[in-house]
Each structure stands twice: as C-alpha cells, then as structure tokens.
Amino acid sequence: MKKELVFRSETLENVFDCLSRKFGVTFNVEDKSLLDDIYTGTFDDENIESIMKVLKMHYNFNYKNEDGIITIQLNE
C-alpha cells in the first residue's frame, strides 16, 4: 500500500503541520511570511529529507534537521 501525500493549494503552514504529524518532527520557521505560501504537489512514500529537498528548491530556503527539529531560513 502506497503512503502518498497529496497537497492541493495548501498553505505551507498546513503542509508543515501534516509533515509534523506524519514524521514526528517539529518545524521552526524563522520568517513566518513563508507559512502563507501555497503548495500543490504529491509525494509518493518519500522520507522527510526527500520532501524537504523538494520544498527547499521550490521556496528558496535553507533548512537543518537536528534531532527532529527542522529549522527553516529564507535565502536572502
């Protein structure tokens, strides 16, 4: 059975909330304006690192994952 995640016109705040529940991580977003951005996409049974790499490229941010706390900083 596939574990597909589908997002249709969801705010990044909702996307991060979903990822938090699914992967047991916490998001620390330094620039809160990013949370209002909209995302549409599908992830097919991917791990949190793969998903974050896609989001990083799409939204031009850097992130670090330390002990389940993912800190996100927008690139200047």
Question: What role is predicted for each listed range?
Answer:
Residues M1-E76:
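A residue-level detector for the "anchor" residue at the start of short, highly conserved motifs
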